[in-house]
Amino acid sequence: QGVADGLAGLARLQWDERHFVESGGHLLFTRGDYELHLADIAFVKVGAVSGADDLYASELYGNRDFVCSSTVRSGTTRRMLWCEAGEPPPAVLLPHRERLITRRIRPFDESNWWHWGRGYHQSALPRVYVNSKTRSARPFFCHPCPNYDGSVLAIFPHDPLLAVQQLADALNSVDWTDLGFVCDGRFLFTQRSLEQSPLPGPLRALLPARSVQ
């Protein structure tokens, strides 16, 4: 009788069909069926990190505009003091040498203490941006500024002729909650997890021409 009750109980359960997906080492149980990966369409790069934004962010001394975490909402960039390799330390940073040389983001010495903690993929190619952490309802966006800081990921399509706004719109249509990228209403993206993320079949139209099957 106990076994019979157990079987009857199973029959009354509301079953929810899921797909078991392994993607770049990530295990997912998804409702949707995903046929390709973002890496088939594009590659993802991380933004630059200064390790001392209060010193490098300056409307007065800055020499480059950077897409930052607030750009998705405001459309505005942040003026930063960028130090290119081979250039001498900017005069405005000289008083802060002791602090900058002790930043822990990477090793610094007398030859590089004024450099940023992490660089970024510098390219004139069109790209889509997304904050690594955001509550924006449409997190993927385009901006003409080619520089981006560490709060932002840049998505470069393999096909340089692909309209990036089309790519952004397509990515904004994906059910990222089903793919495990939403926690407490906030999108959480990393370079690797986003690049390896499965994508639904309709995005196959964005594949480079040689990859379309």
Residue ranges and their predicted role:
Residues 1-129, 135, 165-213:
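C-terminal substrate-recognition regions of SAM-dependent nucleic acid methyltransferases
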Residues 132-167:
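A short beta-sheet element
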